């Protein structure tokens, strides 16, 4: 493995807000002007490279991952050496200006490939938790931090959640979940598809569209509108929009520290097996983790996940379950290719 390379593992922050004026909920956080969003991202140390919106939310492809803005919810995930948690205070400030108050916060990440390269406050999970505790307002009084382990010391799932007594959600259905997949040791032949040809003369958008079709990413959810971007000389990001549900993929294809992530919102009634099979077939990872966050623990859904990927050569090596405030359950599963040891 390289001494140091690009950190693919993302940091992910999800903030929920509420307000007393029902008119605010029509656009809410989407009313924050683009210049203000740029200032938030400047604090994080990333920029917008592509953007799209529909009647439900706005999606931004960033120089380091993605940002999703709903009327009362913001999801921002960034990779590399970005300082994601420094977005919290400015986001709270801009939300307050339009009459919205923070009511929940969730921060998640995997284990960094290059932890010693991370800037403060991402130097350790303890530092991140201390920063979060000091930054979020006191009304978010129901708090919990947890490191969910696996059988491999290099793979764990870090979770911090904080909620006020008043928590509002767009989907109250217990069958709605968020799935975060992290993959390393990508098949080198498949990873080459995320390298651009030198001097191809294409824009990042057109090269991204080509990668989306070449790799079959457009077949994961054929109903989704995809906003994609290819970086030079390599790397890829995409945001998918399917009504009010998002999906996103980020790829760092370099050999030695290759990484890809897939995230989506879904329902236990969806064909989750199809989604997982397509994702695994596109990247053929040597190691993969799946984290699901939902209001209800579904053993049936977890079995579907295992049954979907085992025929493709991935064996479930560990599973951890933890409960968090506001009745959230997080399940963290790890898989490795059968040809590899844990």
Regions found by a protein language model. Give the residues of each.
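Polybasic/polar functional segments that serve as interface/processing modules
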Residues: 1-342
